């Protein structure tokens, strides 16, 4: 392990510090953040940036009620760096296995080996588009045993495609092992589900961490697209919401959600509503509505407007895949826009942010119109924050709009 300079911050503010350092181009991404027993987290900083790092200004900009200091620690390579080395081990294992069976190796086969995958306990889930060459089927199950040994797991599965059944049910093939039930622990929350019946959105980890940092004490939250509890559970376990109404129409996801509420000890603070959320009979009770559906949650906007408290209003967290001009370069960092100001990262994501802000402004106007039509009174909307979750393609970004809605 290397001794490297890092920024020591409180764990509850670590995500905000990480995102800011990343946006300024001074986060050393070769190393992962480390949690410590004293409730702090260390974030690795590029050594050349240390002389220009103003800790007082940094604290005031990110979280004025926190603390930060520079310390030296022995740091391990980040998961991303480790995955690269594991990928090379996987390529070498596949090559050695094929050669041992008298098969020829080629660069095309090397490109057929995935560089990314999901881990759920002792099960690895590969996505579609890899191991597509016919040779992998020809060499049989012994090959998957070798892959499992290389990755340190016992079971292997692969998503072939996503069903168009309205539930986004994954079509998954078990390549090694019989049971498809898994346990996934994410930010101290335990999720149990069947990989052949339910999706797990591992790419949404930054949004789940952001929700976990909210203070929802005393609030009633409605999660319109709950799934197995991706966002419902962070609201309950970490954000301390008084009560969450979780809506989900996939029966398999509902079963997993109810199980996950039980095993995390929060079922007494959650009401599960199975079925189409557009038929939900609730109204005038929510301080916060989560609309976590992509590519668009637009069908849920009228429902969310009906759910907000008429007397005090509340906040909508509106997910959307926003398309930027195709020629524009992809954004590589999670980024944010707050109020009317645009924060520009070193990776030139300003044009993306302009597109997100334009979408958010139009959405805010439409929500105002919907609220007027549903409640019969005027409302004011305020763009509190735009969160960039991830980029799917060079021109498609998953963003979340935090929209404050207040009656006039």
Curated annotation (Swiss-Prot):
S-adenosyl-L-methionine binds at residues 201, 208, 248, 276-277. It is an enzyme of class 2 (transferase). Pathway: tRNA modification; wybutosine-tRNA(Phe) biosynthesis. Keywords: S-adenosyl-L-methionine, Transferase, tRNA processing. Coiled coil: none annotated. GO terms for molecular function: tRNA 4-demethylwyosine alpha-amino-alpha-carboxypropyltransferase activity; tRNA methyltransferase activity. One of its GO terms (cellular component) is cytoplasm. Belongs to the class I-like SAM-binding methyltransferase superfamily. TRM5/TYW2 family. This is tRNA wybutosine-synthesizing protein 2 homolog.
């Amino acid at each position: 392990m290397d001794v490297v300079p890092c920024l020591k911050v409180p764990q509850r503010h670590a995500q905000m510090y990480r995102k800011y350092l990343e946006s300024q181009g001074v986060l050393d991404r070769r190393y992962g953040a480390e949690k410590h027993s004293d409730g702090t987290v260390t974030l690795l900083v590029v050594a050349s940036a240390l002389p220009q790092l103003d800790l007082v200004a940094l604290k005031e900009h990110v979280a004025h009620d926190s603390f930060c200091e520079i310390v030296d620690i022995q740091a391990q390579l980040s998961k991303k760096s480790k995955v690269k080395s594991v990928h090379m081990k996987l390529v070498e294992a596949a090559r050695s296995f094929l050669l041992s069976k008298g098969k020829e190796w080629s660069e095309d086969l090397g490109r057929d080996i995935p560089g990314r995958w999901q881990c759920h306990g002792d099960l690895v889930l590969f996505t579609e588009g890899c191991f597509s060459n016919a040779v992998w089927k020809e060499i049989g199950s012994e090959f998957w045993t070798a892959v499992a040994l290389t990755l340190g797991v016992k079971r292997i599965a692969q998503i072939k495609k996503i069903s168009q059944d309205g539930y986004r049910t994954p079509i998954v093939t078990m390549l090694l092992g019989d049971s498809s039930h898994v346990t996934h622990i994410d930010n101290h929350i335990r999720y149990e589900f069947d990989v052949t019946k339910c999706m797990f959105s591992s790419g949404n980890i930054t949004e789940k961490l952001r929700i976990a940092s909210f203070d929802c004490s005393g609030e009633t939250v409605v999660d319109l697209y709950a799934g197995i509890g991706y966002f419902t559970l962070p609201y309950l376990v970490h954000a301390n919401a008084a009560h969450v109404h979780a809506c989900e129409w996939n029966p398999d996801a509902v079963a997993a959600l109810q199980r996950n509420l039980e095993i995390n000890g929060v079922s007494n603070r959650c009401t599960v509503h199975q079925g189409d959320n557009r038929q939900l009979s609730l109204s005038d009770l929510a301080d916060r509505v989560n609309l976590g559906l992509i590519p668009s949650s637009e069908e849920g906007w009228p429902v969310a407007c009906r759910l907000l408290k008429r007397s005090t209003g509340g906040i909508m967290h509106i997910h959307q895949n926003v398309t930027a001009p195709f020629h524009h370069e992809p954004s590589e960092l999670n980024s944010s826009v707050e109020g009317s100001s645009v924060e520009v990262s070193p990776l030139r994501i300003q044009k993306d942010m302009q597109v997100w802000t334009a979408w958010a402004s139009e959405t805010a106007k439409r929500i105002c119109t919907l609220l007027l039509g549903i409640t019969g009174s005027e409302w004011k909307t305020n763009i509190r924050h735009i969160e960039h979750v991830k980029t799917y393609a060079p021109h498609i970004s998953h963003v979340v709009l935090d929209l404050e809605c207040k009656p006039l």
